[in-house]
């Protein structure tokens, strides 16, 4: 795993979303090369996977708390 990949995994959900917005802006610029666009796409894909995973973790925790409340 690369250093950049490790840093991305530690990123907060909010920072990941902000970076995704930045990537979209960069990819929409006509001066962004094809190679740069591909690198940005790969970074965005990794960030989206991390965000989806965090959302699933939060949903599972909410369900767990809700189930505990129902059992009480």
UniProtKB/Swiss-Prot annotation:
SUPFAM superfamilies: XseB-like. Keywords: Cytoplasm, Exonuclease, Hydrolase, Nuclease. Its EC number is 3.1.11.6. It is an enzyme of class 3 (hydrolase). InterPro entries: Exonuc_VII_S, Exonuc_VII_ssu_sf. The keyword Ion transport does not apply. It catalyses: Exonucleolytic cleavage in either 5'- to 3'- or 3'- to 5'-direction to yield nucleoside 5'-phosphates. GO terms for biological process: DNA catabolic process. Heterooligomer composed of large and small subunits. Belongs to the XseB family. Bidirectionally degrades single-stranded DNA into large acid-insoluble oligonucleotides, which are then degraded further into small acid-soluble oligonucleotides. This is Exodeoxyribonuclease 7 small subunit. It comes from Chlamydia trachomatis serovar D (strain ATCC VR-885 / DSM 19411 / UW-3/Cx).
């Amino acid at each position: 795993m690369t250093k950049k990949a490790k840093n991305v995994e530690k990123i907060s959900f909010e920072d990941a979303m902000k970076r995704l917005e930045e990537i979209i802006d960069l990819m929409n610029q006509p001066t962004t090369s094809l190679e740069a666009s591909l690198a940005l796409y790969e970074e965005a894909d990794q960030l989206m996977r991390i965000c989806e995973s965090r959302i699933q973790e939060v949903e599972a925790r909410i369900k767990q708390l809700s189930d505990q409340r129902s059992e009480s």
